[in-house]
């Protein structure tokens, strides 16, 4: 089918740039020829043309990929641009490949959340057995570190709860006698009570000089 026929079919089906961005990729010609790509008819002409969905938008940042690649070569080594882009695409495909297999397991077990065990299962099922054991150790260390952070947060909450919220009669001590002068010029004696200092565990007292 020629280009004009493709354009007509796309318009009749209501295929717009939003549909294309949902997972269908378009290669746009360098000279911007409208007949070489899918269009949405007069609607796009009135509202302005939309940029086609780029495959680069679903890839990991190429700077991050290049940084990881450089850790495996000598400091004086260089990596060509096409090599970076090739690895960038391979990594993205690998992630989709593993995630799809893990998602299939969740679907069979009627679960909605993919966890670490699902990823390990997918790696083993797809033949990446050499990755399973190192990733299992990493997953265990990661979960232990998360438990440690929760323990620190619990300690902070416990220390905060140790601060008294109510002042009882025993907490007042050392009444100080003083006097004030009222508006009519008469002197009136009053008693001022101060609170006793309580040492709170884990809190250093403030020294005034």
Swiss-Prot record:
Transmembrane segments: none annotated. GO terms for cellular component: CCAAT-binding factor complex. GO terms for molecular function: DNA-binding transcription activator activity, RNA polymerase II-specific; protein heterodimerization activity; RNA polymerase II cis-regulatory region sequence-specific DNA binding. Pfam families: CBFD_NFYB_HMF. Residues 41-52 have a biased composition (Basic and acidic residues). Residues 1-53 are annotated as: A domain. InterPro entries: CBFA_NFYB_domain, Histone-fold, Transc_fact_NFYB/HAP3, Transcrpt_fac_NFYB/HAP3_CS. This is Nuclear transcription factor Y subunit beta. It comes from Petromyzon marinus (Sea lamprey). The lineage of its organism: Eukaryota, Metazoa, Chordata, Craniata, Vertebrata.
């Amino acid at each position: 089918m020629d280009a004009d026929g493709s354009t007509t079919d796309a318009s009749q089906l209501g295929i717009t740039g939003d549909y294309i961005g949902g997972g269908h990729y378009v290669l746009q010609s360098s000279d911007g020829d409208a007949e070489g790509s899918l269009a949405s008819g007069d609607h796009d002409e009135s509202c302005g043309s939309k940029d086609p969905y780029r495959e680069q938008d679903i890839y990991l940042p190429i700077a991050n990929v290049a940084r990881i690649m450089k850790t495996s070569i000598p400091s004086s080594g260089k990596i060509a641009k096409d090599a970076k882009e090739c690895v960038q695409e391979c990594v993205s495909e690998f992630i989709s490949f593993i995630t799809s297999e893990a998602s299939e397991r969740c679907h069979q077990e009627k679960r909605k959340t993919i966890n670490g065990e699902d990823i390990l299962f997918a790696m083993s099922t797809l033949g990446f057995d050499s990755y399973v054991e190192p990733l299992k150790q990493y997953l265990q260390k990661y979960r232990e570190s998360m438990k440690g952070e929760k323990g620190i947060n619990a300690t902070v909450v416990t220390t905060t709860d140790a601060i008294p919220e109510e002042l009882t009669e025993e907490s007042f001590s050392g009444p100080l006698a003083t006097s004030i002068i009222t508006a009519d010029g008469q002197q009136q004696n009053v008693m001022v009570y101060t609170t006793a200092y309580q040492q709170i565990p884990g809190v250093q007292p403030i020294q005034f000089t």
